[in-house]
């Protein structure tokens, strides 16, 4: 999974649309959810979900999970998708993550491939379209898989996209929902325990009064704090985000970093 790393002025205007189609299939998507939720995940993991009531049942929503495993693309729909909340989920994935059985499930659960190094404008527009259509989009704000339990510095792309969407329609009311994923094993195997903790949503409209750059930084900082609380981490330090000299809080836990 990846985070959108940059947004440009070429992003969606009201009369533009992307060429990407990630709409759920009327018959394949229910099958994928059934296989994932009733067969694959329950037979492989022991999953415990808390905070499902915090996922809005309608409106434009960005789910912002930590990223610990390729399995996340199946665990998040299990915890917050069709069978849990009545809502379908869309999310961006790397090309490698749409291969094999896992990839088949991911594609039919709403995943669409994006180049993580040079995401096409069409991919960014599609993410914006999803929010403008008041649907639910998953963005992994850490920007990559980290196999420890720390909350790593968040990339700024999620906040920028959220603010871009909020500015595009005055009544859109975009919400960002923090999600902490915790696996009992760094490289999950059969019987691994998975805890999914879903926090209260952040209202993007609360971050529209100042300059876009500073408000994006503030939203990113508040999302980091929310993820830290879900993780139960204790030590907060300032880290540089994406090498750009922008400081954001990141929470550290004791223990060795694996990823």
Language-model segments: which ranges?
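Non-catalytic C-terminal accessory region of glycerolipid acyltransferases
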Residues: 4-16, 20-24, 28, 121-259
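Catalytic core of membrane glycerolipid acyltransferases/transacylases, capturing the structured
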Residues: 57-118
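A conditional alpha-helix N-cap/helix-loop micro-motif detector
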Residues: 45, 117-121
């Amino acid at each position: 999974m990846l985070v959108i790393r940059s947004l440009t002025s070429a992003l969606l205007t009201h009369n533009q649309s992307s060429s990407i189609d990630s709409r759920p299939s009327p018959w394949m998507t229910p099958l994928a959810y059934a296989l994932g939720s009733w067969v694959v995940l329950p037979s492989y993991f022991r999953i415990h979900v808390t905070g499902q009531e915090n996922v809005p049942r309608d409106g434009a929503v960005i789910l912002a999970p930590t990223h610990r495993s390729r399995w996340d693309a199946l665990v998040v729909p299990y915890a917050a998708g069709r069978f849990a909340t009545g809502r379908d989920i869309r999310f961006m994935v790397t090309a490698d993550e749409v291969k094999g059985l896992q990839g088949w499930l991911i594609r039919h659960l709403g995943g669409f491939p994006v180049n993580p190094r040079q995401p096409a404008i069409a991919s960014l527009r599609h993410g914006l379209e999803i929010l403008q259509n008041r649907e639910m989009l998953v963005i992994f704000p850490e920007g990559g898989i980290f196999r420890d339990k720390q909350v790593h510095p968040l990339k700024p792309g999620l906040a920028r996209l959220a603010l871009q969407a909020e500015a595009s329609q005055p009544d859109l009311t975009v919400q960002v929902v923090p999600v902490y994923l915790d696996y009992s094993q760094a490289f999950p195997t059969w019987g691994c325990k998975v805890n999914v903790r879903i926090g209260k949503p952040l209202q993007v409209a609360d971050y529209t009064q100042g300059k876009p750059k500073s408000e994006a930084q503030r939203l990113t900082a508040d999302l980091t704090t929310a993820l830290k609380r879900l993780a139960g981490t204790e030590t907060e330090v300032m880290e540089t985000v994406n090498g750009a000299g922008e400081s954001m809080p990141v929470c550290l836990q004791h223990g060795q970093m694996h990823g």
